[in-house]
Regions:
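N-terminal signal peptide c-region/cleavage motif recognized by signal peptidases
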Residues: 21-23
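A ligand-binding cleft/hinge motif common to bilobed small-molecule-binding domains
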Residues: 98-109, 166, 170-175, 202-234
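Hinge/capping helix and adjacent helix->loop/strand transition within the periplasmic-binding protein
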Residues: 84-90, 105-190, 239, 251-284
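C-terminal lobe and pocket-closing loops
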Residues: 126, 210-276, 306-309
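An extracytoplasmic/periplasmic, membrane-proximal ligand-sensing/linker region
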Residues: 31-33, 175, 215, 262-323
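Residue-level signal for nonpolar/aromatic packing positions in well-ordered secondary structure
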Residues: 34-36, 43, 50, 67, ...
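N-terminal secretory signal peptides and thylakoid transit peptides that target proteins
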Residues: 2-18
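N-terminal (or domain-start) structured segment
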Residues: 26-115, 155, 164-165, 178-201, ...
Length: 323
């Protein structure tokens, strides 16, 4: 009799156990739209690149990718929006030289730590910038511009809208022994409008964003900040031809909040690598004159660390003080 009671209890226990709820498996990532926050305005290299890669991710995942431009404070506003977002892989930051390298040495009491607050999921671009002037500008080359600046100290101006566009002219000024006046802008479009209108004298814009202005003849390049001439514009001399060793190139990448699960981080890295392997993206980047360095996940942090050290030296030589 005792054995029957035990058996009956065991059977009832098994039946009861069958109704214990089993935790549902998490939905496959991504199961809804992904937002890429670009911490600068439309038309810049970050915006252009984010849209190209976002389109490829859409095709790969069958989920929408929304590009959200949040300019201001040299990229800090958009960067902070991602720092405080849910670490679930659905809010991604387009990182730049400004947000993850130069701001560390140029912004006092920076509200985020590029290392502790973010996990980099891809570093994928390196390029120089063109020194641009109006087509009708009197200077036909860099030497002519420098001669004019020496003849009228403090009279020639350059526009800038982030650290990447401010550092090259400041750096050049130090090396050439000239004095230029900087004019700050909120976004690249405003600076370009004023350059075309003759309100400022020159502007340094990375090769991606410069492309449209070169193709339509609105602006003319005097030089490029790569160590050598760009394959896309072999007629444009490198600044290094006048000042040996001059090289200022930047990077782009993507990052998520640091608490994002590692499996999602790995998937995002894979999406980025697949996007950059596509023939369409490669073709477009060749048109922009870009030099690509697709970094695997293990090397991302090291690349950003090296860039941070490099830009700390750039800004030191340029004499740009923290603000």
């Amino acid at each position: 009799m005792q054995n029957k009671k035990i058996n009956r209890r065991a059977v009832l226990g098994l039946i009861g156990g069958a109704f214990v709820p089993i935790p549902a498996r998490a939905a496959a990532y991504p199961s809804r739209p992904i937002k890429i926050i670009v911490p600068f305005g439309p038309g810049g290299s970050g915006d252009i690149t984010a849209r190209l890669i976002g389109k490829q991710i859409e095709q790969r995942t069958r989920q929408s990718v929304v590009i959200d431009n949040r300019p201001g404070a040299n990229g800090i506003i958009g960067t902070m929006a991602v720092k405080t977002a849910e670490p679930d892989g659905y809010t991604v930051l387009l990182i730049t030289t400004s947000t993850h390298a130069a701001n560390v040495s140029l912004v006092r009491n920076l509200a985020y730590d590029p290392v502790k607050d973010f996990t980099v999921v891809g570093v994928f671009r390196s390029s120089g910038s063109y020194m641009l002037v109006r087509p009708q500008a009197e200077w036909r080359d860099l030497a002519g511009f420098i001669a004019a600046a020496r003849a009228a100290p403090g009279k020639l101006t350059f526009g800038y809208f982030n650290v990447s566009s401010r550092t090259p002219p400041e750096y050049l000024s130090r090396l050439a022994g000239i004095e230029l006046q900087g004019v700050p802008y909120r976004a690249i479009g405003n600076a370009v409008t004023d350059l075309i209108g003759g309100e400022i004298h020159c502007l340094f814009i990375d090769t991606t964003a410069s492309n449209q202005y070169l193709q339509n003849g609105q602006l003319r390049p005097l030089a490029i900040t790569r160590l050598t001439r760009a394959p896309a514009t072999p007629e444009v001399p490198a600044v290094a031809e006048t000042f040996p060793g001059f090289e200022l190139t930047g990077f782009l990448g993507m990052a998520v909040p640091s608490a994002t699960p590692r499996d999602i981080v790995a998937q995002l890295n894979g999406f980025i690598r697949e996007a950059l392997a596509s023939a369409d993206v490669r073709r477009r980047m060749d048109e922009f004159g870009l030099s690509w360095d697709v970094t695997d996940l293990a090397a991302c942090d090291e690349v950003v660390r090296a860039e941070r050290e490099r830009w700390t030296e750039y800004t030191r030589v340029a004499g740009i003080q923290p603000e």
